[in-house]
Structures are given as C-alpha cells and as structure tokens.
C-alpha cells in the first residue's frame, strides 16, 4: 500500500503557496490587462505601429507567464487530487505514481514563478544593455574582457534571450578593450542587474613567456533599455558625435566606410558606441537609444546613492566594486558578495552563471 498523507500534504502546500502568489503577483489585475492586450492585438490597426505591436506582444508573453501558470497550478492540483482518489479507490500503484509525477511538475512550475518575485524592480522586465571595459593590465586585461564577453553571450543565448553585439573595440594584440551587448527578452535587466561591478582574473598569463601569475580586471555595467515615453533631459549641444570605421578584435577593420558612431554626453562624460549596423544612420539611432538608457540608469543610481551608503549590509554597486574573483590556477570562482563558489571554472566561463545570479538576487543585492 502506498503513502497517501504526504501527497495530500504536498497538494495542500502547493495550493497555499499558489494563493500567496496570486495576491503578490496581482493575478486579477494581470488577467484583466491580458484581456485588454489581446483585444488591442486583435485590432489590425495596431500593426500600423510595429514598435507598439511588438511591445504589446512582449507584454502579452509576460502576462501569460503569470496568469496561465497560476491557472495551471489551480487546475493541476485539482487533477492530482482526482488521480489520488482513483489510485486509492482502485489500489493502483501506476495511477499513484502518475499523481506524484504530476505533482512534482507542478512544484517546479511553482518554484519558477516564486523566483519571479525577485524581479520586483520597476525596470526588471525591460531589455538590457551590458557594457564591458577592460581594466589596467594591457593585453592580459583585454583578453580577460573578451573571455567575459564570450561568457555573457553564451549565458544569454542559453537563457533564450535575443543577444546582439552592439559594439566591440579590438585590443592592441588580442582580446577587446570594451564591448556593448544588448539582451532582448523577458526580465533581461532583472536577470543581469546584479552583474554590475568589477570582475577579477588571476591566472598564469599565456602572454607571459615566463608563465607568471597575473591579476587582471574588467568592469561590467548593466542598464535597462528605457521606453521612448520616458523623458531624459538631453541637450543636443551637450553631445559630441564622432564617426569612424568599425573594427573587430585585433584591430582589423570590419568595413571600409565610416559607419560606426560614437556619442559622448559631455556633462557626464558618458560614452556609447554602435557599429553593428551597416548604416551610419541606424548606428546613430541605436547609439542614441543606448545613451538615453545609460543616462537613465546613472540618474537612478544617483538618486539611490544616499540609500545605498546607509545600508551597510549591501555592497556599493559602483564601478569600483569588485563582485567576483576568477582564480583559474586554483580552479575557484567566488562571488565576494554572497560567498557562492564554483570549482568548475570552465563551466562558468562557458556561461553557466545562474548559480551566482540567483544567489545575488535572493540576497537582495
């Protein structure tokens, strides 16, 4: 005979957790908004504004992820309860096993939805930009910056984000001096926002004929893509716009026309670059979008600076903050904020970052 009470208790627990999430995630409001979005998308006129239609499509996906999951949890627990009753009545082990399996699937869906509570920031659902910049250390630091770029590109692709390399400036000998990546997808900024900071590499340098240990640094800065409706005070006279030939790793030119665009916001010395489009006009439009997003994030950080300094338990998230060390000779990668470690260094550098990111989100960084 099988143990029924543990399964009954699990069903009860899942129902209670689902009910808590229903309130926390504003299920009723999201359900109502989903109906409104569906109605808008059914109106053929919406496709006259492609950007608006795409934004509605993304909103629909985000709303469905909550509404449909909660609906599945509610009906799913009812179904499991029915299976359990059948199993007990018929004394059927196979039906009992099926009930347990379905319950495990429901619990996985519930845990994934519970994790969404970490994305409570006002811009967590936005697309995101990641700026990488090599620190001091010459070729070794530039190679490290390129390794980080590869790591984040692989992570983004594995998470199902659309990943765009907006700009990369080749290193003097190897690697890159810097790069900007755009991540498009649900909660891109929410996933990435705790990656802002300094990443430290310790290894025997392949560029040192003596095989000595070198320490290198690279900075990551993450900021959300902002809606066009958000007003950012940007005086055209404060902008310096330069055009240049796009170049790849190692300094080689990737095209022969001056289509790449660099925009500097002089008052804040904020610089953005774009070279992934063939057209100078498109690169300029993308660079302006990046600049708006970056200035928005800097403004948010400035507004929160006083609060951050008062919260002793939390790290300063400025450019000077070292968040993670990668000591390859000792096969150890450690997050200095959460204490999370991994000995599988190659796996992490191949993009398996969720262990670190989830820990930082759960700790409220």
Curated annotation (Swiss-Prot):
GO cellular component, one term: cytoplasm
Modified sites of kind N5-methylglutamine: 252
Family annotation (Pfam families): PCRF, RF-1
Keywords: Cytoplasm, Methylation, Protein biosynthesis
Reported modifications of this chain: Methylated by PrmC. Methylation increases the termination efficiency of RF2.
One annotated GO molecular function: translation release factor activity, codon specific
Compartmental location: Cytoplasm
NCBIfam families: prfB
Free-text function comment from the UniProt entry: Peptide chain release factor 2 directs the termination of translation in response to the peptide chain termination codons UGA and UAA.
Similarity comment: family membership: Belongs to the prokaryotic/mitochondrial release factor family.
Protein name in the entry: Peptide chain release factor 2
Native source organism of the sequence: Pseudoalteromonas translucida (strain TAC 125)
Gene label: prfB
């Amino acid at each position: 005979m099988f143990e029924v009470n543990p399964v009954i208790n699990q069903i009860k627990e899942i129902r209670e957790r689902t009910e808590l999430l229903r309130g926390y995630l504003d299920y009723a409001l999201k359900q109502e908004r989903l109906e409104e979005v569906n109605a808008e998308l059914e109106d053929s006129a919406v496709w006259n504004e492609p950007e608006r239609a795409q934004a509605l499509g993304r909103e629909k996906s985000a709303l469905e992820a909550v509404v449909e999951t909660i609906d599945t949890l509610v009906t799913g627990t009812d179904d499991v309860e029915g299976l359990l009753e059948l199993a007990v009545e018929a004394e059927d082990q196979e039906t009992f096993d099926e009930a347990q399996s379905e319950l495990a699937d429901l619990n996985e869906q519930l845990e994934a939805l519970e994790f969404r509570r970490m994305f409570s920031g006002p811009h967590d659902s936005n697309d995101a930009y990641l700026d990488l910049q090599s620190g001091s250390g010459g070729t070794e630091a530039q190679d490290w910056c390129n390794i980080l770029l590869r790591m984040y590109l692989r992570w983004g692709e594995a998470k199902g984000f659309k990943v765009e390399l907006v700009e990369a400036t080749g290193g003097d000998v190897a690697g890159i001096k810097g790069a900007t990546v755009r991540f498009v997808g649900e909660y891109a900024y929410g996933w990435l926002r705790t990656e802002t900071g300094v990443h430290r590499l310790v290894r025997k340098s392949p560029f040192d004929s003596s095989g000595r240990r070198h320490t290198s640094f690279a900075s990551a800065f993450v900021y959300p893509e902002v809606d066009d409706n958000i007003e950012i005070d940007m005086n055209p006279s404060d902008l310096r716009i330069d055009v240049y030939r796009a170049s790849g790793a190692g300094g080689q030119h990737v095209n022969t026309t001056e289509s790449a665009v660099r925009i500097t916001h002089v008052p804040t010395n904020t610089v953005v670059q774009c070279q992934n489009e063939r057209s100078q006009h498109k690169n300029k439009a993308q660079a302006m979008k990046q600049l708006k997003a970056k200035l928005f994030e800097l403004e948010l950080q400035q507004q929160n600076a006083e609060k951050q300094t008062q919260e002793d338990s939390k790290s300063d998230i400025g450019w000077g903050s070292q968040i993670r060390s990668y000591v390859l000779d000792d096969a150890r990668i450690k997050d200095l904020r959460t204490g999370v470690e991994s000995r599988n260094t190659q796996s992490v550098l191949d993009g398996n970052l969720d262990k670190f990111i989830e820990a930082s989100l759960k700790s409220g960084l």
